[in-house]
Amino acid sequence: MEKFAPEFHGEDANNKATKFLESIKGKFASSKDPKKKDSIISVNSIDIEVTKESPITSGTNIINPTSEADSTPETKANYPRKPLVSFKEDLTPSDNPFSKLYKETIETFDNNEEESSYSYEEINDQTNDNITARLDRIDEKLSEILGMLHTLVVASAGPTSARDGIRDAMVGLREEMIEKIRAEALMTNDRLEAMARLRNEESEKMAKDTSDEVPLNPTSKKLSDLLEDNDSDNDLSLDDF
């Protein structure tokens, strides 16, 4: 027959429980120092008790924002306009006969104060494509002349025989280029004058023609009469067209 633990009921069970709690009271006494205060950290609604000996620490890292450079328009440097053609070599030696010519040419072709004589409409008009192309060719030829002058400046520092030969050849080419540029400029001016005359003529015609009537050719007149009379005898034949 199996043995079971004794059962206690009523006052007897209460006395037994009291004696058991008094017997184990000294075994689980707290060893914490009463002077040290504990802190309670609540994490996700769960209370965690942390003593002062806990290695849990907290710190804050302060990041200093870097000061950006002042980029106001007043502090920005104004860079000068670069010339159309520039060279790295020193082109102004005192004993060079072509340095003055080269300098004057650069100043003539790279004057910031000069503006184009063509208006915005003339430059962007589709009918002026040929004129724009001519101006582009003139610009290219002017750049070639600057290159020739630069070659003259560099060649002037070489031997006498080579210098004289290059000088004669380059001077001749320069004269030819100048003549071609003059011819292109004259043709461009003539074309602009012709366009101006046509524009003035059209403006005069539009100013004189103030009526709303449109002239009709013979076929249009027959069609108009047919619609006005509404007569079947005035039908048009293929010969009328």
Swiss-Prot record:
Biological processes, Gene Ontology terms: symbiont-mediated suppression of host NF-kappaB cascade
Positions of region (Binding to RNA-directed RNA polymerase L): 216-232
Composition skew (Polar residues), residue ranges: 54-75
Post-translational modification note: Constitutively phosphorylated by host. Phosphorylation at S-116, S-117, S-119, S-232 and S-237 is required for transcription inhibition by M2-2 and viral particle egress. Phosphorylation at S-232 and S-237 increases the affinity of the binding to the nucleoprotein.
Source superkingdom: Viruses
Region annotated Disordered, chain positions: 53-79, 200-241
PROSITE patterns: EF_HAND_1 (PS00018)
Keyword Cell inner membrane in annotation: no
Modified residue annotations for Phosphothreonine: T108
Region described as Binding to host phosphatase PP1: spans on this chain: 81-87
Comp. bias intervals (Basic and acidic residues): 200-211
Assembly and binders: Homotetramer. Interacts with protein M2-1; the interaction between the two tetramers is required for the anti-termination and elongation transcriptional activities of protein M2-1. Interacts with host phosphatase PP1; this interaction recruits PP1 to the inclusion bodies. Formation of a complex PP1/M2-1/P allows P to target host PP1 phosphatase to the M2-1 substrate. Interacts (via C-terminus) with the nucleoprotein N (via N-terminus); the phosphorylated phosphoprotein P binds to N-RNA complex. Interacts (via N-terminus) with the monomeric RNA-free nucleoprotein N.
Record remark: domains: The N-terminus is important for viral particle assembly. The oligomerization region is central. The C-terminus part contains binding regions for the RNA-directed RNA polymerase L and the nucleoprotein.
UniProt protein name: Phosphoprotein
Natural source organism: Human respiratory syncytial virus B (strain B1)
